[in-house]
């Protein structure tokens, strides 16, 4: 995955096309392009079909997806902060397809709870709650009247709590990888 997102010219072209839709403010076109053109993975494991009870082999990884940041610069800064976080220790962190978000693949202990599905789900919830609590996702946009309230959708994407949730890949030549866990 790291090699694909850091060096694929095809993915670079697809990502640029998807990001242009975002920059033009066309959410409908952005979503369509993302879903129809970008490759994706299911970080939680390999599934026999798209249903959470079809998890024959968990990967030991979960994904935390942070969306709707105010700028690409903010996304780059958060990518580094998440990667350097001593509790999360992501094995991979990269900028999302929109350019205004971050995806982090976070390892967890496969043996903590015997029930694989429950163990994975609890780790997903822990990671999402931790990231939301530790990192400030209040909008810093100057036009926002109440900067303490998050009305922008900015922050952890909670729809990613489903084990079979697809994680769309995007080109990021500055993606961060941890080769030793």
Labelled PLM ranges:
Residues 128, 132-136:
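Contiguous ligand/interfacial binding patches
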Residues 61-63, 105, 166-168:
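Conserved hydrophobic/aromatic beta-strand scaffold that supports enzyme active sites
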Residues 95-102, 161-166:
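Short Gly/Ser/Thr- and Asp/Glu-enriched loop/turn motifs at secondary-structure junctions
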Residues 1-100, 108-125, 151-154:
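Signature for HUH/AEP ssDNA processing cores
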Residues 6, 10, 110-112, 135-181:
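Catalytic "initiation/cleavage/transfer" segments centered on a nucleophilic residue
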């Amino acid at each position: 995955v790291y090699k694909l997102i850091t060096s694929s010219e095809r993915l670079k072209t697809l990502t640029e096309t998807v990001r242009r839709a975002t920059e033009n403010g066309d959410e409908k076109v952005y979503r369509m392009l993302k879903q129809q053109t970008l490759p994706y993975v299911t970080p939680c494991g390999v599934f026999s079909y798209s249903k959470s009870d079809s998890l024959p082999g968990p990967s030991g990884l979960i994904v935390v997806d942070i969306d709707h940041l105010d700028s690409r610069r903010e996304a780059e800064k958060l990518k580094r902060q998440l990667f350097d976080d001593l509790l999360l220790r992501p094995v991979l962190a990269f900028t999302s397809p929109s350019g205004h978000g971050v995806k982090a693949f976070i390892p967890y202990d496969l043996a903590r709870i015997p029930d694989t599905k429950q163990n994975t789900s609890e780790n997903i919830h822990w990671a999402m709650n931790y990231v939301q609590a530790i990192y400030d996702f209040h909008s810093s946009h100057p036009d926002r009247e109440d900067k303490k309230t998050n009305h922008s959708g900015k922050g952890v994407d909670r729809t990613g709590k489903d084990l079979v949730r697809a994680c769309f890949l995007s080109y990021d030549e500055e993606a961060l990888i941890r080769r030793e866990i």
